[in-house]
């Protein structure tokens, strides 16, 4: 059973998937930083300096804190600001992946077009066919008697 598991893990597809998941996790961190550190401050500046992360609705009368962390400590809250931030993260990530796939598809299409446009070179005929062609050509140039 252990040897089967080792063989399964050592297969190329599983290793490629593992690398993809690790890189995807790191890419998610980059997108989160892009949204939190670069995009959200600009959005906040445009819309009057608000921060989505602290937008919430208290679900009980005991919650009266000004920040989301303090409000969660006091009771249940509907944290729609956090959801908006995650939604923006997702949309940016989806847009980036869409652009990457679109670029790869465009490059693939260009390569296919170049392959179709390039004339196919016929392989040289076999030696015996070349010899027979030369003999035919020589016989055709001989004067007939």
From Swiss-Prot:
Q: Which spans are transmembrane here?
A: 14-34, 38-58, 81-101
Q: Where in the cell is it found?
A: Cell inner membrane
Q: Which NCBIfam families match?
A: mscL, PRK00567.1-4, PRK13952.1
Q: Which family does it belong to?
A: Belongs to the MscL family.
Q: Name one GO cellular component term.
A: plasma membrane
Q: Which organism is it from?
A: Rhizobium leguminosarum bv. trifolii (strain WSM2304)
Known role: Channel that opens in response to stretch forces in the membrane lipid bilayer. May participate in the regulation of osmotic pressure changes within the cell.
Q: How does the entry describe its membrane topology?
A: Multi-pass membrane protein
Show the GO MF annotations: mechanosensitive monoatomic ion channel activity
Q: What is this protein called?
A: Large-conductance mechanosensitive channel
Alphabetized UniProt keyword annotations: Cell inner membrane, Cell membrane, Ion channel, Ion transport, Membrane, Transmembrane, Transmembrane helix, Transport
Q: Sorted alphabetically, which InterPro entries does this protein's record hold?
A: Mechanosensitive_channel_CS, MS_channel, MSC/AndL, MscL_channel
> Entry's Pfam families?
MscL
**Subunit structure of this chain's protein:** Homopentamer.
For this UniProt entry, what is the primary localization, expressed as one broad class? membrane
């Amino acid at each position: 059973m252990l040897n089967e598991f080792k063989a399964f893990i050592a297969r190329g597809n599983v290793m490629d998937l593992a690398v993809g998941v690790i890189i995807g996790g790191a890419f998610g961190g980059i997108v989160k930083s892009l949204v939190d550190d670069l995009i959200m401050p600009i959005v906040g500046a445009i819309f009057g300096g608000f921060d989505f992360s602290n937008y919430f609705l208290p679900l009980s009368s005991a919650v009266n804190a000004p920040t989301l962390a303090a409000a969660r400590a006091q009771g249940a809250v509907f944290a729609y600001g956090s959801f908006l931030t995650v939604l923006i993260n997702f949309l940016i990530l989806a847009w980036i992946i869409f652009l990457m796939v679109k670029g790869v598809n465009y490059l693939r299409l260009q390569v296919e077009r170049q392959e179709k446009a390039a004339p196919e070179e016929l392989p040289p005929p076999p030696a015996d066919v070349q010899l027979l062609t030369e003999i035919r050509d020589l016989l055709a140039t001989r004067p007939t008697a």
